[in-house]
Amino acid sequence: MNFWATFSICLVGYLVYAGHLNNELQEIKSILVVMYESMEKHFSNVVDEIDSLKTDTFMMLSNLQNNTIRTWDAVVKNGKKISNLDEKINVLLTKNGVVNNVLNVQ
């Protein structure tokens, strides 16, 4: 056996013989309980913060999706209006004898 194993066994034997082992274990237990409660509190705070950020992110993504849908609808409506106006102008130009040869000018 190495030195530290022998030392540890002797220390535990002494603590058992002197009656201090139970007290030492209770102190270690109380320290571990305090550490656990502190870690649980911090973990709960982190989870709450992540949850609030997740909620905010989903709200922003939902707003972005709604704005995108409205923008595309407006683009489609305006595109149809522009197309209709272009057709009406072409009909009027054709009726009045004005030929649109802008690209064919020599």
From Swiss-Prot:
Q: Which UniProt keywords apply?
A: Glycoprotein, Host cytoplasm, Late protein
Question: Got a GO cellular component term for this one?
Answer: host cell cytoplasm
What role does this protein play? Answer: May be involved in formation or transport of the nucleocapsid-containing vesicles around the nuclear membrane.
- What is the species of this protein? Autographa californica nuclear polyhedrosis virus
Post-translation changes: Glycosylated.
Principal subcellular localisation of the protein: host cell
Q: Where in the cell is it found?
A: Host cytoplasm
Q: What is the designated name of this protein?
A: Glycoprotein GP16
The UniProt record lists the keyword Glycoprotein: yes
The gene it comes from is: GP16
